[in-house]
Amino acid sequence: MYAYENIEMSLNYIEQHLSEKIETEKLAEIACLSTFYYQRLFKKLVKKSVQEYIKLRRLAMVIAELNNSEERILDIALKYGFS
């Protein structure tokens, strides 16, 4: 399996679990890599750190929900782990 395929598996996991707590160790396990190597490879391929990428994806989801929902801002923010 190529390195980008390992990272792609973890990206899929991130997308499916954005409203949950996501641990870097779990992502590394999904990608079949050590945590250290996973973080280095992720940053090299995605051009962002793992946690920065997750935060930006969550912000994008919050923005989309704010535009398409009548839910309160606080409820949407809490749904995606912002406090």
PLM features per residue range, with description:
Residues Y4, E8-E25, K44-Y80:
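Terminal helix-turn-helix DNA-binding modules in bacterial transcription factors
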Residues I30:
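Short, basic/aromatic recognition patches that contact phosphate-bearing ligands
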Residues S34-Y37, S83:
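Short coil turns linking two alpha-helices in DNA-binding domains
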